[in-house]
Regions:
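C-terminal "cap" of GNAT-fold acetyltransferases
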Residues: 142-174
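Conserved acetyl-CoA-binding loop-helix of GNAT-fold acetyltransferases
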Residues: 85-111
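Short glycine-aromatic motifs
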Residues: 4, 19, 44-46, 135-146
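Conserved GNAT acetyl-CoA-binding A-motif
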Residues: 109-125
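A conserved beta-strand-loop-helix scaffold within acyl/acetyltransferase catalytic domains
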Residues: 20-81
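Residue-level preference for hydrophobic side chains embedded in well-ordered alpha helices
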Residues: 15-18, 74, 99, 103
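Conserved beta-strand-loop-alpha-helix junction that forms the acyl-donor binding cleft
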Residues: 120-136, 154
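Short amphipathic alpha-helix that is part of the acyltransferase structural core
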Residues: 1-33
Length: 174
């Protein structure tokens, strides 16, 4: 692994600054980082972390409280463009995998130590193979398994809210 460090974001101003940068990026989900929307979500985050390499923020994401003792890890994951995996660059010039190597293990340990059940999700059925691969690559001690169905993680009228779920238990209240 590269020499990266996870740091907690404790101030809303720093978080919103990162969201503003992400919302202006070419990230496919840039609209998900809208500052006004993220400001409204701030109080539902139990922890927000960033991945740092030197002075550079590589990525950020949070642990979002879904209620009923359930949290979503790597919520609103943002990865800087040069660190994103691209199907055109299978050789991967940048071997840093923020979700797999850092955020999912760190945030899951943080949440399970506090008694929460965890999940993470990926949109659309066509990304199920990627979700299966990611779940297999995680350390077994984290306890993740890919659940058999698609689940509504937000407004079911929005097709992007129906997602593949990997969770630390088989039955989650979604």
């Amino acid at each position: 692994m590269e020499n990266c460090v996870i740091q907690e974001i404790t101030y809303i101003d720093e978080f919103l600054s990162l969201c503003e940068m992400a919302s202006k990026s070419k990230h496919p989900n840039a609209k998900n980082y809208d500052v006004a929307q993220m400001k409204k979500r701030w109080n539902k985050y139990l922890i927000i972390t960033k991945l740092i390499k030197g002075d550079e923020v590589i990525a950020f994401s949070g642990v979002y409280d879904y209620g009923n003792n359930l949290v979503r890890v790597v919520d609103r994951l943002y990865i800087e463009q040069k660190y994103r995996y691209n199907f055109m660059t299978k050789s991967i010039a940048n071997p840093i995998k923020p979700a797999l190597q850092y955020f999912i293990p760190y945030q899951t340990q943080w949440a399970t130590d506090k008694g929460y059940d965890c999940f993470f999700s990926i949109q659309t059925r066509r990304k199920r193979n990627a979700m299966e691969r990611l779940t297999r690559q995680l350390h077994p001690s984290l306890g993740y398994r890919l659940l058999p169905d698609l689940y509504e993680t937000c407004d079911p009228k929005n097709p992007l809210c129906i997602q593949n779920i990997s969770a630390t238990r088989d039955n989650i209240p979604l």
